C-alpha cells in the first residue's frame, strides 16, 4: 500500500537519521523546546487515562483518583468517550537536562467526529498511537493512524494496558506492523493506569516529535481546532499559532468570514485558562476576543491579522455537514419556549449541532436537529434531557435524501414529511458511506449476513493478520442509523469495530410510508424505505405501535400507507375493563395511588387527534429495526 | 369518626386471587389477637393524633361533616328508626356509628372470641356512650360481619345475632362449584345457600353476598344462575366485583387459560347490572347493588370521604383528615398493637378535595356535589377539579346535573382512566 511505504520511509528517515543527532539539531527561534502532540486511539483504549497520568506526572494536577480530567462532561465519562477536544500545556524536564513545553491536544474519540480529529491533528507535529494490549488494533486505530500519517505527523506507537492479565503485547506489535506498517518492535509499553512506561513515553515525545516550525516575525496565522463558550468572554477559540504572535490589544480576522475582533486575552491551558502576555508561533493556547456569536467560529478556520488579509487559510477547512437528522418536540406543547432556550444554550458548547424550527401536525412545534452521526445524536438527546431537564419526543432519525423531481430539479430533504407528492418524484438518491468493519475472522459470517440485510455492498475483504478481517462496504447511511452499530456489536460479541467516510449519493427505489393513527396521519412517524422492504417494515412498526399504545375508550385503527394505498393495518380494540372494585377495608390510599400512577402515565402521553400516544411510541421507533 | 373497622387476618385457606393480609394456620393466635385489638381500641385516639384530634373535635366545624342523614337520602323508604338513631348517635364524633368486621375470615373467631371482642369494644373509649353490654351492638346503626359459608356454624350465627349484629356479608363469590374450586374457595354452593337460609331463619333482615365476575370458565348462564338464586332467596344487598389479577397472587402467577376476557367481563357486568336493576336493586356504587334502604352505610362513609378507624394488622384509618395504616404483621401487632403505624399520609387540601371527588363519583346515584365539595375544602382548592369535571362531562364521560356530577353508566367498567383525570390533568 502506498501509504505504508510513505510511512515506512518517514519513520526510517526520522529514526535512523534524526534521532541520534536530535540533541545536536539546532532549530531557529526558541521553538526547539516545544512539542505539540496528540493521543489517538480506538474508543476505550485508555486515551483519557493516559492523559490524566501525564498531567499528574508533570504536576499539572495533584491527584486524579477516578476523575478523567479531560473528559469533563459527565456523559463522556459515563460512556467512556471524549466528545470535545481539549488541550493542556505541560512543563517537562527531560533527561537531557533541558526544559520542554509539551502541548497535549486531546482529540474526540468517535467515528462521528472524523473532521474534528483531523483538525486537532493539524495542530500537532506528533501523535501517540495508543493500542489496548487486550484488544489489539481496531477500526479507529487504523482510521486515526491514517489521518495522522496523512497530516504528516510523527507517530509514536504505544501499547497500553500492559498490566492486564490478558494483554497480548506480541500480537499487538505484529498487528501494528501488519495493518499499519509501523515497526511493532519500536512500540513503547505503557500502563496508563499504574504509570508504567509513561516517563519513557515523555522522553520519546521529546526525542521523536519534531519541534514546530514557523516564525514569529511572519504575519499571524492560527488554526482554530476547538472552541467553547464562556458566559462572560464569549466564544473562546482554541488555537495553534503557525506564524506570528498574539497579545492583548491585537486585532484578529477570521479568514472565512472576514470578521475582525479585538483581542482581549490570550493564554494557555493548564488545564484551566491561564492568561499570559503573548503567545507566539509554535504555541498552543486560547484567544479571548469577546466573540458573542456562536456561529462565527468554526473548527478548522484560520485566524489571521487584518493587516495581512492576504494571508492564506490553513488548507482543509470546511463547514461540517450534519449527516443524521431528527425532530425533537416537547411532550407538553407549552414547553416549546423552554426547549428553544435549552437548544440555544446547548449550541454554545457544541456548534456542530444545527437546528431549525419545524412543525408537525401531530406533535406541534419543535425543532429539526442535525448531527454528525448516530452516536452524536444519542449523546445530544441524552444531554438535552439531562442538563436542561426537558422531556422530549425524538422522531425517527433520517438522512438527507436527494429527491429529483420530474421537472429535472432536485432537493435535499432531511425530513420524510417534506417529501413531494410521489407523482412529482422522478427518482430518489440516498447517501452512501464507505464502511470498514474490523472483526475477528470467526465473526465474518454473521457480520456479512447482517450487512446483507442492510443492503450493503461488499467491495473488499482484507486479512491484516491471520485472526482478523477488514470488510469494506458501500453502505447506505440510512441503514447505519437504524441500529446497525448496536447489532454489529452484538453479533460480534463486542469485538467488531468500524469506521466510515461519506462516499456519495446513489439512486434507489424508495417510497415514503405514512402512519395513520385513527385516520390521522402522524407525520412524525413517516419514514422512507426501499420499496421492497416497505411492507415488512410497516407491518413491524404497526405491530409495535399496537403494543405501545394503550387501549382507549374507542377502537383505534393503525395503518401504514404509501400514497393512498394501505399496506399494513392492525386495530387496537376499545378498552372494556379498567375498574377498581374492592375497597380493601377502606384502604383508599392504595386506590388513590393506583389512579395517580395512571394520571402520571397520562402526562407522558402525546395527544394525536383524540388518541393518547405514549412517548415510547416515538422513542422506540428510533430503533425500529427488528 | 363514623365507622369502626376491625381486620381479622385469619384464614383456613388462601383463595387464589386474594392479596388481602391474612394468615393460614394461625388460629392459635386468635385469643392474643383479640386482646391486642382491645388494647389498640383502648388507646384511642392514636398518640400522634391526640393533640390534633382534640383540637379538631373542639372546633368541630359542622360544614366539614356531611349532613347526618345524607346516607339515607337516596332511600326514602329506609326505616324511620334507622334514620332517627343515625341522627342521634352522629352527635359524638368520638364514637362509631357503624361497625364492620372484615378479613380474612371473621367467622373463624368463633363464638367465644367474637363475644370477647365485641364486649371489649363496647367498654372501650370508642363505644357509643351509655351502651349496656347485654344490648350488644343493637344500637350501633349498622354492624356488619363478614361470614364465609364454610365457617357459618348455626351456633356462631346465633352468637352473632345475640351480640346484636344487624347485617351479614356472605363471601359467596359464585354458586357454581366448578368456579369456586377454580379459585381455591373451600366451600360449596350448597353450603353458601344453607348458611344464608340459616341466617334468615335466625331473623337477619339485611344480608349481603359477594359475587365475583370473571372467574375461570364463567359464562352468563352460570353467573345468571348464581344471581337468580340469591335474588330469589330474598337477600337485600349484592357486591359484585370484577376479578383482578393482583401481583403476587397465585392467580396472577399462573392465570388459567379459561379466564374470561376483558370483553366478556364487561359484558357479564352489563348483564348483571341490567338484571339486578330489573329486580328492584339500586346500583348505588360501582360494585354495589342494594334494595332501597339497604345500602351499606359503613362503605358509604368510605366513598364520602368520611372518617373511620381501622383496628388490627393492615387496617387503614382516616381521622382528622389524615389517612394512616397499620403494618401487615400479626406478630408485631400482637406484641405492640399501638405501635404499628406503617405510614401517615399528609395531603394538601387540594389533594384531599381531588381524592374525595374521585371517591364520591363512585356513588352512581348520589354523585359528586361540587357546591358541597367547595364548602368543605374551599373554592380555591376545588376550582381546578371543577374545570376537569366539566371537561369530562363535555366528553360524555360524566353526566352533569346542576352542581352535581355523576359517572355515565356506560363508563362504569372503564372508570379508572376517568378518575385518573379527576385527580390530576
Placement of each model-derived feature along the sequence:
Chain B
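Glycine-biased, low-complexity coil/linker segments
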Residues: 51-55, 60, 127-135
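Short hydrophobic targeting helices and cationic amphipathic motifs
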Residues: 49, 53, 62-65, 72-75, ...
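Short, amphipathic alpha-helical interaction segments positioned at domain boundaries
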Residues: 412-425
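N-terminal [4Fe-4S]-dependent radical SAM core
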Residues: 1-4, 414
Amino acid at each position: 500500500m502506498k501509504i505504508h511505504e510513505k510511512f515506512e520511509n518517514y519513520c526510517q528517515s526520522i529514526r535512523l537519521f534524526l534521532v541520534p543527532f536530535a540533541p545536536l539539531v539546532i532549530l531557529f527561534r526558541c521553538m526547539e523546546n516545544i512539542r505539540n502532540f496528540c493521543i489517538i486511539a480506538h474508543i476505550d483504549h485508555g486515551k483519557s487515562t493516559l492523559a490524566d497520568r501525564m498531567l499528574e506526572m508533570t504536576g499539572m494536577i495533584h491527584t486524579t483518583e477516578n476523575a478523567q480530567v479531560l473528559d469533563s462532561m459527565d456523559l463522556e465519562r459515563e460512556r467512556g468517550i471524549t466528545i470535545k477536544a481539549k488541550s493542556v500545556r505541560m512543563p517537562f524536564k527531560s533527561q537531557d537536562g533541558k526544559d520542554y513545553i509539551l502541548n497535549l491536544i486531546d482529540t474526540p474519540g468517535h467515528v462521528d467526529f472524523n473532521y474534528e480529529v483531523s483538525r486537532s491533528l493539524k495542530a500537532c507535529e506528533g501523535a501517540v498511537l495508543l493500542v489496548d494490549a487486550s484488544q489489539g488494533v481496531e477500526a479507529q486505530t487504523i482510521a486515526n493512524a491514517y489521518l495522522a500519517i496523512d497530516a504528516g505527523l510523527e507517530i509514536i506507537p504505544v501499547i497500553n494496558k500492559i498490566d492486564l492479565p490478558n494483554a497480548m503485547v506480541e500480537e499487538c506489535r505484529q498487528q501494528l506492523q501488519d495493518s499499519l506498517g509501523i515497526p511493532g518492535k519500536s512500540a513503547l509499553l505503557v500502563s496508563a493506569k499504574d504509570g508504567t512506561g509513561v516517563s519513557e513515553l515523555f522522553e520519546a515525545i521529546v526525542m521523536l516529535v519534531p519541534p514546530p516550525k514557523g516564525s514569529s516575525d511572519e504575519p499571524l496565522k492560527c488554526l482554530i481546532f476547538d472552541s467553547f463558550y464562556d458566559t462572560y468572554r464569549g466564544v473562546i477559540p482554541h488555537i495553534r499559532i503557525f506564524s506570528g504572535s498574539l497579545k492583548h490589544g491585537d486585532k484578529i480576522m477570521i479568514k472565512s468570514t472576514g470578521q475582525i475582533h479585538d483581542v482581549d486575552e490570550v493564554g494557555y491551558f493548564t488545564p484551566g485558562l491561564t492568561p499570559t502576555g503573548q503567545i507566539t508561533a509554535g504555541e498552543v493556547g486560547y484567544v479571548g476576543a469577546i466573540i458573542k456569536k456562536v456561529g462565527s467560529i468554526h473548527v478548522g478556520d484560520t485566524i489571521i491579522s487584518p493587516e495581512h488579509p492576504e494571508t492564506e487559510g490553513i488548507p482543509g477547512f470546511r463547514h461540517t455537514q450534519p449527516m443524521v437528522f431528527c425532530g425533537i418536540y416537547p411532550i407538553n406543547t407549552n414547553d416549546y419556549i423552554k426547549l428553544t432556550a435549552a437548544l440555544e444554550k446547548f449550541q454554545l458548547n457544541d456548534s456542530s449541532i444545527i437546528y431549525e424550527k419545524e412543525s408537525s401536525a401531530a406533535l406541534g412545534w419543535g425543532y429539526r436537529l442535525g448531527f454528525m452521526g448516530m452516536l452524536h445524536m444519542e449523546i445530544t438527546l441524552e444531554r438535552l434531557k439531562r442538563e436542561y431537564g426537558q422531556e422530549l419526543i425524538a422522531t425517527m432519525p433520517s438522512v438527507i435524501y436527494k429527491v429529483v423531481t420530474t421537472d429535472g430539479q432536485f432537493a435535499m430533504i432531511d425530513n420524510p414529511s417534506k417529501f413531494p407528492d410521489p407523482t412529482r418524484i422522478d427518482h430518489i438518491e440516498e447517501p452512501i458511506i464507505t464502511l470498514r468493519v474490523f472483526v475477528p475472522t470467526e465473526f465474518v459470517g454473521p457480520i456479512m449476513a447482517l450487512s446483507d440485510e442492510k443492503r450493503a455492498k461488499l467491495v473488499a475483504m482484507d486479512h491484516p493478520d491471520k485472526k482478523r478481517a477488514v470488510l469494506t462496504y458501500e453502505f447506505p447511511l440510512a441503514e447505519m442509523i437504524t441500529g446497525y452499530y448496536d447489532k454489529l456489536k452484538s453479533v460480534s460479541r463486542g469485538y467488531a469495530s468500524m469506521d466510515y467516510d461519506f462516499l456519495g449519493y446513489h439512486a434507489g427505489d424508495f417510497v415514503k410510508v405514512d402512519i395513520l393513527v385513527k385516520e390521522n396521519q402522524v407525520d412524525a412517524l413517516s419514514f422512507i424505505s426501499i420499496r421492497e422492504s416497505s411492507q415488512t417494515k410497516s407491518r413491524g412498526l404497526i405491530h409495535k405501535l399496537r403494543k405501545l399504545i394503550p387501549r382507549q375508550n374507542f377502537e383505534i385503527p393503525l395503518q401504514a400507507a404509501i400514497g393512498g394505498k394501505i399496506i399494513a393495518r392492525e386495530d387496537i380494540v376499545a378498552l372494556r375493563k379498567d375498574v377498581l372494585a374492592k375497597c380493601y377495608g377502606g384502604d383508599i390510599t392504595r386506590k388513590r395511588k393506583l389512579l395517580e400512577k395512571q394520571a402520571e402515565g397520562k402526562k407522558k402521553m402525546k395527544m394525536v387527534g383524540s388518541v393518547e400516544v405514549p412517548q415510547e411510541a416515538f422513542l422506540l421507533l428510533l430503533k425500529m429495526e427488528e | 369518626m363514623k365507622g369502626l373497622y376491625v381486620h381479622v387476618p385469619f384464614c383456613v385457606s388462601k383463595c387464589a386471587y386474594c392479596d388481602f393480609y391474612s394468615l393460614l394456620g394461625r388460629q392459635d393466635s386468635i385469643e392474643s389477637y383479640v386482646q391486642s385489638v382491645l388494647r389498640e381500641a383502648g388507646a384511642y385516639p392514636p398518640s400522634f393524633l391526640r393533640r390534633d384530634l382534640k383540637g379538631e373535635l373542639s372546633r368541630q366545624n359542622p360544614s366539614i361533616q356531611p349532613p347526618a342523614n345524607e346516607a339515607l337520602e337516596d332511600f326514602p323508604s329506609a326505616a324511620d328508626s334507622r334514620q332517627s338513631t343515625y341522627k342521634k348517635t352522629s352527635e359524638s364524633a368520638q364514637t362509631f356509628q357503624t361497625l364492620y368486621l372484615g378479613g380474612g375470615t371473621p367467622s373463624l373467631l368463633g363464638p367465644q372470641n367474637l363475644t370477647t371482642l365485641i364486649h371489649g369494644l363496647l367498654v372501650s373509649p370508642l363505644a357509643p356512650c351509655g351502651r349496656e353490654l347485654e344490648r350488644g351492638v343493637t344500637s350501633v346503626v349498622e354492624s356488619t360481619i363478614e361470614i364465609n359459608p364454610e365457617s357459618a356454624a348455626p351456633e356462631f350465627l346465633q352468637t352473632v345475632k345475640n351480640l346484636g349484629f344487624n347485617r351479614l356479608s356472605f363471601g359467596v363469590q359464585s354458586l357454581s362449584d366448578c368456579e369456586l374450586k377454580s379459585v381455591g374457595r373451600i366451600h360449596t354452593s350448597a353450603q353458601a345457600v344453607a348458611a344464608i337460609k340459616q341466617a334468615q331463619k335466625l331473623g337477619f333482615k339485611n344480608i349481603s353476598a359477594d359475587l365475583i365476575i370473571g372467574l375461570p370458565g364463567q359464562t352468563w348462564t352460570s353467573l345468571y344462575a348464581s344471581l337468580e338464586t340469591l335474588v330469589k332467596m330474598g337477600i337485600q344487598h349484592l357486591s359484585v366485583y370484577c376479578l383482578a389479577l393482583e401481583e403476587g397472587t397465585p392467580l396472577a402467577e399462573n392465570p388459567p387459560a379459561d379466564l374470561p376476557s376483558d370483553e366478556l367481563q364487561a359484558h357479564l357486568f352489563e348483564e348483571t347490572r341490567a338484571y339486578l336493576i330489573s329486580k328492584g336493586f339500586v346500583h348505588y356504587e360501582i360494585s354495589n347493588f342494594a334494595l332501597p334502604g339497604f345500602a351499606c352505610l359503613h362503605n358509604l362513609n368510605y366513598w364520602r370521604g368520611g372518617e373511620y378507624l381501622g383496628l388490627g394488622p393492615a387496617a387503614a384509618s382516616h381521622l382528622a383528615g389524615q389517612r394512616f395504616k397499620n403494618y401487615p404483621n400479626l406478630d408485631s401487632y400482637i406484641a405492640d398493637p399501638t405501635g404499628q403505624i406503617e405510614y401517615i399520609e399528609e395531603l394538601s387540601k387540594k389533594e384531599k378535595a381531588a381524592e374525595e371527588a374521585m371517591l364520591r363519583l363512585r356513588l352512581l346515584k348520589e354523585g359528586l356535589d361540587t357546591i358541597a365539595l367547595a364548602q368543605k375544602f374551599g373554592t380555591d382548592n376545588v376550582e381546578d377539579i371543577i374545570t376537569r369535571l366539566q371537561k369530562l362531562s363535555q366528553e360524555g364521560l360524566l353526566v352533569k346535573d346542576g352542581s352535581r356530577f355523576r359517572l355515565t353508566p356506560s363508563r362504569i367498567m372503564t372508570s379508572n382512566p376517568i378518575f385518573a383525570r379527576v385527580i390530576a390533568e
